[in-house]
């Protein structure tokens, strides 16, 4: 599903996209990822919750891969796009290990580990990435 959005937004001639075109493509990736995440069913058990966390990990990694595959604008707009994607990748590289810890804690029903993993997730500061998304024209990826 996310891959289809990538092909719809990024193929064509050899010209670099404009800032607005990059922003629209990035926003589509973010919207598709949000849609995938909201489609995950509310878990009814710890085992269901662990499976849901795996789906979150997969969707998150997939959206990052799709963002990284987008063509960037030239010049300052391209630099802004690169900074946004690098910041997003940094956040995700912090988040996935915390999600894996949460999944493992859910599987083992370790309440203390769950609380610790949730705290790690909440501690990830998205302020810079949100500002960089807006600067890159990807306002839909902010917040």
Residue ranges and their predicted role:
Residues 12-14:
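Bacterial signal peptide processing site
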């Amino acid at each position: 599903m996310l891959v289809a959005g990538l092909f719809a937004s990024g193929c064509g001639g050899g010209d670099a996209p404009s800032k607005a075109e990059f922003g629209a493509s990035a926003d589509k990736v973010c919207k598709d990822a949000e849609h995938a995440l909201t489609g995950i069913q509310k878990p009814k058990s710890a085992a269901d919750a662990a499976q849901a966390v795996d789906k979150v990990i997969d969707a998150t990694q997939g959206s990052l891969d799709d963002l990284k595959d987008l063509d960037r604008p030239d010049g300052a707009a391209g630099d802004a796009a690169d900074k946004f994607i690098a910041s997003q990748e940094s956040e995700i590289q912090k988040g996935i290990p915390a999600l894996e810890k949460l999944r493992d804690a859910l599987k083992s029903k370790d309440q203390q580990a769950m609380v610790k993993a949730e705290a790690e997730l909440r501690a990830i500061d998205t302020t810079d990435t949100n500002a960089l998304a807006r600067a890159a024209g990807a306002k839909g990826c902010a917040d």
